[in-house]
Regions:
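Sec-dependent N-terminal signal peptides
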Residues: 4-13
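Extracytoplasmic copper-binding redox domains, predominantly the cupredoxin/blue-copper superfamily
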Residues: 17-227
């Protein structure tokens, strides 16, 4: 896939007691890349890049706005969880959540104004209506996919909920690194979501033993370019 450069290298060394292989990845942000150079992934539940580039929510960090997860094989699906996406300062906090299928997310309003949260995404459509400070409404996400969340009143508000049946999910650390140990051998799809790039996909083969290293290049984002 053009615009998504990944380097895969299988390392031979491994312990016989190892239950599976490790996938170690690194997200690299490239100032020279732009959204037009990224071909959208052919994926039924894909999330497309955001056209209007709304303002960033504070506090989550550059890589906190990137989600990675692995699909395929025996994912040993994790049960639903309860999570929260606050409405604060006319932003969603956090801006990006990754949750298992069937999870319930609360959307409390912490602002002294009304909000009206909604989504038109195929994976989960909803409209929570108008509600004031101190009130909260919940949404259950029964289907895997990417759900983009907005506010009818404040167009700058934007959030994303990644819903997946995979147990291998992560936000990269502040250096852009992520890893999962003990992945059974087989063929998988590495999924990467970033607001500017949308959803990107790369097929990865996990060997019986050793480690697979993956490097993913995405466009660099900043608060200035987001507006």
């Amino acid at each position: 896939m053009r615009g998504l450069a990944l380097t895969l290298a299988a390392l031979v060394a491994s312990s016989p007691a190892m239950q599976g292989s490790e996938l170690a990845g690194k997200i690299t942000l490239d100032r020279k890349m732009v959204r037009k150079s990224l071909a959208p992934a052919v994926y039924d539940l894909r999330g497309m890049a955001v056209a209007d580039r709304p303002a960033y929510s504070p506090g989550q960090g550059t890589f906190g706005r990137v989600a990675v997860w692995l699909e395929g094989g025996d994912s040993n699906f994790l049960g639903p969880v309860a999570a929260t996406m606050n409405q604060k300062g006319r932003h969603f906090e956090p801006e990006l959540l990754i949750v298992p299928t069937g999870s319930k997310i609360s959307f409390p309003n912490l602002d002294p104004i009304f909000h009206n949260i909604f989504s038109l995404s195929r994976a989960r459509k909803f409209d929570l209506g108008y509600y004031s400070e101190g009130k909260s409404r919940d949404v259950v996400f029964p289907k895997a996919g990417i759900v983009q969340v907005y506010c009818h009143i404040h167009p700058e508000m934007y959030g994303v909920v990644i819903v997946t049946s995979s147990k291998w999910t992560a936000h990269p650390n502040p250096d852009g690194n992520f890893s999962w140990p003990d992945i059974p051998a087989g063929k998988y799809r590495l999924m990467v979501w970033q607001r500017s790039a949308g959803l990107q996909e790369k097929r990865v083969t996990i060997p019986q033993s050793g480690s697979v290293q993956v490097e993913v290049r995405l466009p660099e984002e900043s608060e200035d370019t987001a507006r």
